[in-house]
Amino acid sequence: DMIITHRPYDYHRDHRYTSQLVMDASYMLIVPHYFGEFPPQTREMPVICYAFDKFKNPKPFQIDVLLNIDDIYEEKVKAIAHHESQFFEWLPWTIQMENIITEETDLDKRLELVGMVLNNNFGPISEQYFEFLKTAFPGKKNVSFEAFEICEYGKQPKKSELKKLFPGAYFTKPGELDKYNK
C-alpha cells in the first residue's frame, strides 16, 4: 500500500497539516489494540511518498521516483479540471486573474488553464533534468513528469516493490541527479 501526500514544507497550511497528519497517523496503522474495535489490517507500514514541489527550504525535494506521464497527461488535466473550486475559483483569485474563468467559459479554455498550472508546477522537472530524462526515458517526448520522494516515516521499499507501485518509472540512485540540481 502507498500514501501520496505533500511535504511538510508546503506553502498551504492544509497541505502542511495533511502531511503531518499522515506521518502521525501512519505509525498507528500497525499498532495493536490502539482501537480495539478496529484491529490493524496489516502489520506492514505503507510506503509514503511526497508529491513534487519546488520548495528549497528547509530542504530541497529529493527525486527518488520519476514517472513519465506523456501518454496520460491529457487524462490528468481532465481529471483535475473536475476540482472546480480550486482550479477555477480560488487559484485564479490568488493571482488576480479571477475574471479569466467565468461560468460561461468553455471546457477547452478551462483545460488550457489547468494545463498552465500543471506546467508551472511540474515543468521544472523536464526543464532541469532534460538531458538526464532523454537517457532515463529513451524514445519518449519527455514533456510531462511526476516525481516522488520516499518519506522516511513510511516503509522503505525495495526496488521490486517500487516497480509494482510505479510501473514504467525510473528510480534514481543516491546522488545521481546532483549535477543537475541548481
Predicted regions and their residues:
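C-terminal accessory domains and tails appended to enzymatic cores
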Residues: F35-E44, F55-K59, D64-K182
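Active-site beta-strand->loop->alpha-helix modules in alpha/beta enzyme cores, enriched
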Residues: D1-F35, T42-E44, Y50, F61, ...
